[in-house]
Amino acid sequence: MAASSRAQVLSLYRAMLRESKRFSAYNYRTYAVRRIRDAFRENKNVKDPVEIQTLVNKAKRDLGVIRRQVHIGQLYSTDKLIIENRDMPRT
């Protein structure tokens, strides 16, 4: 993979993770982060430049979807789950 293409993929990976961590819902947040990591690990050995570009374009579309869903989730936020409350003492 060319250096510029590698930098582009890493930048896209970081942007997707960063944006996914903004989901207000715990389940969406953990699923999105896990799915992004799995997808990038699955495709880390791809060498064909055409296939890499196809995957990058798909990831850019997915990043747009994540941004849109994060925004919608913030409009209709819900209470935090018990698992998210770290201030509560454990018994």
Curated annotation (Swiss-Prot):
Reduced mRNA levels in Friedreich ataxia patients. The keyword Mitochondrion applies. Pathway: Cofactor biosynthesis; iron-sulfur cluster biosynthesis. Disulfide bonds: none annotated. InterPro entries: Complex1_LYR_dom, Complex1_LYR_LYRM4, ISC_assembly_LYR. Signal peptide: none annotated. The modification N6-succinyllysine is found at residue 47. The keyword Phosphoprotein does not apply. GO terms for cellular component: iron-sulfur cluster assembly complex; L-cysteine desulfurase complex; mitochondrial [2Fe-2S] assembly complex; mitochondrial matrix; mitochondrion; nuclear body; nucleus. Its main location: mitochondrion. It is found in: Mitochondrion; Nucleus. Stabilizing factor, of the core iron-sulfur cluster (ISC) assembly complex, that regulates, in association with NDUFAB1, the stability and the cysteine desulfurase activity of NFS1 and participates in the [2Fe-2S] clusters assembly on the scaffolding protein ISCU. The core iron-sulfur cluster (ISC) assembly complex is involved in the de novo synthesis of a [2Fe-2S] cluster, the first step of the mitochondrial iron-sulfur protein biogenesis. Homodimer. Component of the mitochondrial core iron-sulfur cluster (ISC) complex composed of NFS1, LYRM4, NDUFAB1, ISCU, FXN, and FDX2; this complex is a heterohexamer containing two copies of each monomer. Component of the cyteine desulfurase complex composed of NFS1, LYRM4 and NDUFAB1; this complex contributes to the stability and cysteine desulfurase activity of NFS1. Interacts with FXN; this interaction is nickel-dependent. Forms a complex with the cytoplasmic form of NFS1; this complex increases the stability and cysteine desulfurase activity of NFS1. Interacts with NFS1. This is LYR motif-containing protein 4.
